[in-house]
Amino acid sequence: MCGIVGYIGYREAWPIVLKGLKRLEYRGYDSAGIALLNESGQNIYKKAGKVAVLEEFAESADRSGTIGMGHTRWATHGVPSDRNSHPHTSNNSKLSIIHNGIIENYATLKEELLGRGHEFKSDTDTEVLIHLIEEIQKIEQIDLLEAVRLALQEVNGAYAIVIMDNDHPDRLIAARKGSPMVIGVGKGEYFIASDATPIIEYTKNVIYLKDGEIALVTKDDLLVKQLDNVVQTPLIQELELKLEMLEKGGFDHFMLKEIYEQPRSIKDCMRGRIYPNEGKVQLGGIKEFAEKLKNIDRIIIVACGTSWHAGLVGEYLIEEYARIPVEVEYASEFRYRNPIITEKDVVIAISQSGETADTMAAIEMAKERGATIFGICNVAGASIPRLSHAGVYTHAGPEIGVASTKAFTAQVTVLTLMAFYMAQQKGTITTSKMIELLTELEEIPEKIQQALGSNDIIKEVAEKIKDSTNCLFLGRGSGFPVALEGALKLKEISYIHAEGYPAAEMKHGPIALIDEEMPVVFIATQNSSYEKVISNIQEVKARKGKVIAIVTEGDTEVKKMADYCIEIPDANEAFLPLLATIPLQLLSYHIAVMRGCNVDQPRNLAKSVTVE
């Protein structure tokens, strides 16, 4: 959600922090701000709107200083405005703070501080935190690091914070709980950020702060403590991220680039994990649990958004091939009820970023109740892999567009591999069948490349329906989660109201909406429910609905009925979700572009939802 950048060293901080905020724009935000320290004191610049607005606002201002921090805000407490933008200052204006997260007990703390004479300039929970830190430092007569440590013990909620002190212009203080934070290690300089994207062009050596850790950062040194005051020895890791991965590479938008990267990202996801000639899948991340997989009672998949749709595909695959019962849960709902969980359950947590707050809370609860946790994640070093007993990385590479594309197909690929691996362990699949499936799975990247070849046709279809106000997506079997994902993509980036349904459920309500103005997108590939989908198409046509069908290459039956057909290569039913998703991504993209929408940064959306 919010983006954080900090710098301390020998270079000018402004260009580093500003570029870092631009790198973090993909996370979603509504305002931006930067604070700098130099010989004359602290300078804070903040504006509602894009980073470019902030840059223009501060163009003629004093932007000197080798210590600075910046923030992109996604409003939670207080409307988007200049005064609610970060950084915020203490009552005496000597301390400043940037913050990602939510302080849940801020209202109670604010009342106490108001009673002690504090005056607030914003409506945010963040300003309350920096006032609390100042108050504790004043009353206890302690240094700032200790005041921060004590203050954080009084707050409930999640946070990643960076604090600057006018009286000590040679240091930054950073801390985190429930929100991500990474520290880049340079020579005579340190970088702080929400993720590694602002850091990669300066250093590949990073430290991922753990929950409940506080860091005192100077240009030459780093001290890390836990909230209980125990000093830690941080682990320095090397980033695999490359700078060119963060550029558009000639595409108009990151989303389009990432759609076209899917043949490669899926190949990367499978590399070293499938052996078609032997009919074997190897998943090193979960191999130590191979024996346990033979005796588990149930799998529970927890996720949010697009990852939840991937989980639904996983449910079909795991039950079909491994014959293990699967439940797919919204993490945000699962964590707030009292689910029955035993030590014979495996919980699979899916998150692109590995920092999704509700998913983290769900697996922490399941872990406490004895379940084994497997994580599926795209970001090495993120929180969910660290919280999990084992897991599998998707290796999709950085995904900058807010609307997920290649991360979704990589998650589905990993779930496919997990389904086959579990089937292999349980003996529910023959070697000959596995050879057949893996041989075809190896061909999927090339088939996705073929599906991308329909881009011009998809663009023509987009032109025909771009002015619609509603759209329905229908599918059966594993085509249902594809329909859900197609609807989500369209509403996310084009702002057209869209819903996904099982095709058979159409007559239980949605059919009332169908008329000549309603586009209905069918996942109508030649699978086990093909004939039933044809009947559903006929029902829509009888009510004059406009039918757009995703069909298997060479299909003639659906073409007789549909207004528009988009072909994908033929494939085993297990792999159709990977192929059928591609034209829906392109359709949503082109409609959004034609409507003049901000494709990479849709309104009100955040790439990584790190608050509940």
Task: Report each predicted region and the residues it spans.
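Structural beta-sheet core signal
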Residues: I4, L36, I97, I163, ...
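Glycine-rich oxoanion-binding loops at beta->alpha junctions
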Residues: G49, T66, G70-R83, N277-A290, ...
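Generic C-terminus detector
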Residues: N229, K546, K559-M561, A571-E612
